[in-house]
Design a protein with these regions (language model features):
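Glycine-rich, low-complexity intrinsically disordered segments
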Residues: 4-175
Length: 175
């Protein structure tokens, strides 16, 4: 075997050589206006898709080239157990409320939010800044059913204009 061809992959967790398992998906936090949102039960995936633009040159009619086109950032759903925390309702009402268009907040309805992924010790391991978000859907209560015994969930769907990982957040040393 030619040793020069086989190189070791970079460690997945450079600050924690003992660690082999990836992070879990059940410890996370969302910050809206710099404050953590209590009781979140679910955040949908951060997902972007770039359309493909096909391009053919006249001198090469047998194949086409594929170029990146417009990138779309998919909506993000946030869910929390119903409580007396008004953060979802107040944000949704900045876009639309019973007082009509005049009550819409043209200044404050868009917010930059932060999504933090936490390790099992509760330390931030990855952080994403989500830009220019606004609420496009709001569910104050779920379907109510006397034959079920489940937690009532409040939900918002937010539109966004892009997200990026906060490179300043690095892997914390675990104990």
């Amino acid at each position: 075997i030619d040793e020069g061809r086989w190189k070791m992959a970079a460690p997945k967790f450079p600050a924690n050589a003992h660690r082999h398992d990836p992070y879990r998906n059940f410890k996370f936090q969302i910050l809206i206006d710099g404050k953590p949102v209590a009781g979140l039960t679910r955040v949908s995936a951060l997902h972007k898709i770039t359309e493909v633009v096909e391009y053919r040159e006249g001198g090469d009619p047998s194949s086409s080239r594929k170029l990146p086109g417009r990138t779309e950032y998919r909506p993000i759903t946030l869910e929390q157990g119903v409580s007396h925390d008004p953060v979802f309702e107040k944000w949704a009402n900045l876009v639309n409320n019973l007082d009509g268009d005049a009550a819409m907040s043209l200044k404050n309805f868009r917010k930059n939010i932060v999504l933090n992924l936490l390790n099992l010790q509760g330390s931030v391991v990855k952080s994403y800044m989500i830009h220019r978000c606004w609420v496009s859907e709001y569910s104050a209560l779920p379907d109510l059913d006397a034959n079920e015994s489940v937690v009532a969930i409040e939900k918002i769907v937010i539109q966004n204009e892009g997200w990026e990982r906060d490179e300043a957040v690095s892997e914390p040393t675990e104990s």
